[in-house]
Amino acid sequence: MSRKARDPIVLPQGVEVSIQNDEISVKGPKGSLTQVLAKEVEIAVKGNEVFVAPAAHVVDRPGRMQGLYWALIANMVKGVHTGFEKRLEMIGVGFRAAVQGSLLDLSIGVSHPTKMPIPTGLEVSVEKNTLISIKGINKQLVGEFAACVRAKRPPEPYKGKGIRYENEYVRRKAGKAAKTGKK
């Protein structure tokens, strides 16, 4: 059972939560998100707090879904209130990025430019041709798109060239040792 899920989720001002049938919907200044609820959890809204508890009919490990849905709802609340952002930096000679309409155009050292469609609900911007900023209200969508962009050219361990998250540590390897002439 999750220890965090024992605490209620406090709703910031301007965020509303509503539950209809098996679906929770969170609305805030940045937009709205919905999530289908599992039968193993019960959600209660009291004032400006949301409580997540295991359902009474669940006998086998009653708290196993409680932590998951607590985290999902907390991320929804944070997303509609402040939003999420992932920043990627491109390191390498000739590496560039540009946003063209609903496409992210990457020049990453291959013979052709790589074009990636930007999912709806995300805002992508490029600074200084090498810094990509991905913003949105859905934490999963922001992280998934950032991981897809990074996967196009992950940083290599010898020179560190590639696409990496901002402030990501890339473990470096030593190159081949120079010939010494000894036999």
Curated annotation (Swiss-Prot):
Keywords: Ribonucleoprotein, Ribosomal protein, RNA-binding, rRNA-binding. GO terms for molecular function: rRNA binding; structural constituent of ribosome. It holds the Pfam family Ribosomal_L6. InterPro entries: Ribosomal_uL6-like (IPR000702), Ribosomal_uL6-like_a/b-dom_sf (IPR036789), Ribosomal_uL6_a/b-dom (IPR020040), Ribosomal_uL6_bac-type (IPR019906), Ribosomal_uL6_CS (IPR002358). Coiled coil: none annotated. One of its GO terms (cellular component) is cytosolic large ribosomal subunit. One of its GO terms (biological process) is cytoplasmic translation. Part of the 50S ribosomal subunit. Belongs to the universal ribosomal protein uL6 family. This protein binds to the 23S rRNA, and is important in its secondary structure. It is located near the subunit interface in the base of the L7/L12 stalk, and near the tRNA binding site of the peptidyltransferase center. This is Large ribosomal subunit protein uL6. It comes from Chlamydia trachomatis serovar L2 (strain ATCC VR-902B / DSM 19102 / 434/Bu). The gene is rplF.
